[in-house]
UniProtKB/Swiss-Prot annotation:
The keyword Protein biosynthesis does not apply. It is found in: Mitochondrion. One of its GO terms (cellular component) is mitochondrial large ribosomal subunit. It comes from Danio rerio (Zebrafish). Gene3D superfamilies: 3.30.70.1730. Belongs to the universal ribosomal protein uL10 family. Its main location: mitochondrion. This is Large ribosomal subunit protein uL10m. Keywords: Mitochondrion, Ribonucleoprotein, Ribosomal protein, Transit peptide. The keyword Endoplasmic reticulum does not apply. Residues 1-24 form a transit peptide. It holds the Pfam family Ribosomal_L10. One of its GO terms (molecular function) is structural constituent of ribosome. One of its GO terms (biological process) is translation. The gene is mrpl10.
Length: 252
């Protein structure tokens, strides 16, 4: 009897009961804020920002005066160097740098240095302040972006244009040549003029030709010279009379 009861009551191996009792425990609540430590509470109370009370409304207060910033010592030094540059050099050209590489810039400096043309870099703010306070104020509109100054003690425009032809990243904007401002077209026209040495040679050859003619005329007979002088006087007198007649006709 007992054996049969035990067999009925005790669960068999591998048998799962139809209903099971599951115990649900209380969940831990973690959303409660921790209380602030009393020392931290004291520190927060002491360091709490208390806005000042205004004695007058904001509209009645006077506006703040902005302090004008003085030029730094570096700006003063660069300004002095720029002033000396305009005094010593006869040709100063302004060009814009359109992202030229460092290697190409080195080659350009080397080509310009062969013709005694120096490449100078100055901050735009310093350059504008100097130009606006000098006789070269008309050059200030050329100073914008990354600018480069090409300076030489003698005007060597043709050599400068030949050197810049290999670097299209350097765009020539204008130049001041012997205290005269030139645009890009003016620089091209100036480069087509003959050099000073050629002009001097032509002048000397013309003067020597005139002196040689004068010497050859002086070697002639005095009667021939007097006849030439009389003819010259007659031509001058006839020219003066024609001029007076034209003036009288215009006045009438």
């Amino acid at each position: 009897m007992a054996a049969t009861l035990c067999c009925r009551l005790l669960p068999k191996a591998g048998w799962v009961p139809l209903t099971q009792s599951v115990r649900h425990g209380s969940k831990a609540v973690t959303r409660h804020k921790k209380p602030v430590h009393f020392q931290k509470q004291k520190l927060l109370a002491v360091t709490e920002y208390i806005p000042p009370t205004l004695s007058a409304p904001p509209a009645a207060l006077a506006p703040r005066v902005k302090k004008t910033g003085e030029e730094s010592s570096l700006a003063v030094m660069l300004r002095k160097d720029l002033e000396n540059l305009f005094q010593e050099y006869k040709m100063i050209a302004v060009a814009q740098n359109n992202a030229i590489s460092a290697e190409d810039m080195i080659h350009l400096k080397h080509r310009l240095k062969k013709h005694a043309i120096n490449v100078k870099f100055f901050p735009n703010q310093v350059t504008r302040s100097f130009l606006n306070s000098s006789i070269y104020g008309n050059m200030s509109p050329l100073i914008f972006g990354e600018t480069v100054l090409l300076a030489s003690k003698e005007p060597k425009v043709k050599e400068m244009l030949q050197a810049l032809r290999h670097n299209p990243q350097i765009v020539l904007l204008g130049a001041c040549i012997e205290n005269t401002l030139f645009s890009y077209q003016g620089i091209l026209s100036y480069s087509k003029l003959p050099s000073i040495a050629i002009i001097r040679g032509e002048l000397v050859s013309g003067l020597t030709m005139m002196t040689s003619k004068t010497v050859s005329m002086l070697h002639h007979h005095p009667a021939h010279l007097s006849a030439l002088l009389q003819q010259y006087v007659k031509q001058q007198s006839s020219a003066d009379t024609d001029k007076d007649a034209s003036i009288q006709e215009a006045a009438a």
